[in-house]
Amino acid sequence: MKQKLLIIGTVWPEPKSSAAGSRMLQLISLFKAQEWDITFATATQDSPNRYPIEDLGVHAQAILLNDDSFDVFVKELQPEIVLFDRFMMEEQFGWRVATACPDALRILDTEDLHCLRKARHLAVKEKRVFKLEDLNSDTAKREIASIFRSDLTLMISTYEMSLLKNYFQVPETIIYYLPFLVKPSSEKELSKRPTFEERAHFCTIGSFRHEPNWDSVRYLKESIWPMLREELPKAEMHVYGSYPPQKAMQLHNEKERFFIKGWAKDAQQVLQSARVCLAPLRFGAGLKGKFIDAMTVGTPCVTTPIGAEGMHDNLPWAGIVAKEEKELVLAAKQLYSDKTLWSSAQENAAAILKSFSEELYVAEFLKQVKELQHNLHRHRNQNFMGSMLLHHSMRSTEYMSRWIEAKNK
C-alpha cells in the first residue's frame, strides 16, 4: 500500500514566480519518485499562475483556516507524513495534525529563516549594521518554537544550519540540510550556451513580492546603475520578476537604459542572454534561486555577501562578491568587460552546481525519513523541549483558533 504525504502549502506552487515554488516542486517530485500518494492542501485562493500539480498525479485540496473541517479531512486521509511549507503553516495546522494523526511524521520546510531575513531588513531600514542580537525577535520565538515542535526541519543553507545549532541551540537531530537539488546539464545543453561575445547587458530576476528582491531593484536604480551606466555606456539593465507593482513599473527608463521587463516565462532563457547577473541584495536569507539559474546557463553573478551566503562555502564564487556601492560597480564593470575573468567565473559555477547535485542528497534524505518513521516515539522522547512547546501550542493556539471559529459562525 502506498504511503501518504500531505503537504500544507502557504500558497499554490508557482515555480515560474519564485524560488520557493521551484523548491516545493522539487520536494513533490522527490516523494513522487518513491511512488508516494501526495495531497497538496492550501487555504489560499487558486492562482492562474500555479503549477498544474494534478498532472504529476498530486491531489489538490482547498482547506480553511480556523475550521474543524480540516480535522475531518486530515483524520480521513491519515497521512504517514505531513510537510508544512514554512513555520506559519505549522503554527496554524500543526496542533490539529498532532491531535488527529499523532503517529504522522511532521516535517517543516523553512525555505529560509524568516527571523534572519526580517532582522537584516530592520537593520537596513535603520541604516545600521546587523547584529546577532537582532535575532531575538517575536518572529524568531515563533519560528524556533515551530522548529522544536516539528520532528524534522529542512534547511537549505549551511549558514542557517550553523545559526540554528550555535546561536539558537537547536539539536542537530531535528534539523536536516537539504538544499536546492540540481540536475546536471547535458553536453548538448552546455554546447548551446551563448559565448561571451554573443551575450550583452545586465540582468536580474526575482519576485517583486519578495521584499529583498524589491529592495535590490530600488538599490540598483538609485545607487548602483547611475554609476555603472557611466562606466559602460552601451550596457543596459534588464529587470525581470513576477508580480511587478505599478511603483516598480515606474522605474522603467529607456533614456537611462534601465528596463523593467516584468514577468519572464523562462528565467533561465532571459539569464542566458545576459552577460552578467547583477543582484545587490542588502538583506535576505536562504539560497537564491536566481543564482542557481544563472550558474546553470553559465551567466556569472555579481552580488553581496548576503546574496552568496550558504551557496558556495569554501568554493570560489561564480563571479564577484562585493559589499559597498563602489565595489559593486567596479565588480560589475570588470566581470562585464574581462573575458578571462568571466570564463573563470563560469568554471567556478560548474563546481558550485556540482555541490548541489541531487544524487548527493536524495537517497540520504529518504533514508533519514524512514529511520525517523521507524523510531518516531524514541525520537520525540529525546526532544522534550519540542513536546513541551507542542503541549502549550495545542492549548493556546487551539483556544484562539476555536474562538475565531466560533466568532465566524
Task: Label each PLM-derived region with a short phrase.
Residues 79-80, 272-286, 299:
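Acidic donor-binding loop of glycosyltransferase active sites
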Residues 1-50:
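N-terminal subdomain of nucleotide-sugar transferases
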Residues 92-93, 140-172, 248:
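A short, active-site helix/loop in glycosyltransferases that binds the activated sugar's phosphate group
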Residues 318-326, 334-339:
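Conserved acidic donor-binding segment of nucleotide-sugar-dependent glycosyltransferases
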Residues 290-293, 300-304:
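Short hydrophobic beta-strand element within catalytic cores of glycosyltransferases
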Residues 166-170, 175-273:
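Conserved catalytic-core segment of nucleotide-activated headgroup transferases in glycan assembly
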Residues 14, 103-137, 197, 207:
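Acceptor-binding helix/loop patch of EC 2.4 sugar-transfer enzymes
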Residues 343, 348-409:
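C-terminal amphipathic helix plus adjacent low-complexity
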